Amino acid sequence: VPIITHCEDTPMIDAELARHRERYGDDIPARLHPDIRSREACIRSTRLALDLARRHGTRLHVLHISTADELELFEAGPLVDPDGKVRKRITAETCIHFLRFAREDYDRLGHKIKCNPAIKEASDRDALRQAIAGDVIDVLATDHAPHTLREKETPYVRAPSGLPLVQFAL
């Protein structure tokens, strides 16, 4: 049975959120979401999870990969050998929104694309697309979160994370 985990370093995120709240209060600009839920928070947590899984021989599935740097931590190749034997003990998933949007889209869409982990750079988006073709990403998910437009239009600290994306699974 695999362990399934969402990897972000909470103390790093909490420190960045506190720093931004000092400056902006509750109305932090949406474009700063990738600074609060940073690439470093993702990489550190993902690296730790993979190190522990490898050390203990644990099957691990990491959810919501959002950076090119995280991709480098995973093995490329098919999930199973031609004889049907499981080849990968550690697998990765990314979400549709990480393949569609990039950091600059926060300026136009604001909290409508606020999700955890945050959408990162265009270069990360491009690397994730390539990772699907290269058998590094094993699962593509929606991470469906049916928040209303009214909820998404609230100030940063009240605007929920997640996007309503179930339609892409159909």
What kind of feature is each model-predicted range?
Residues R150-A159:
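Basic, amphipathic juxtamembrane/active-site segments
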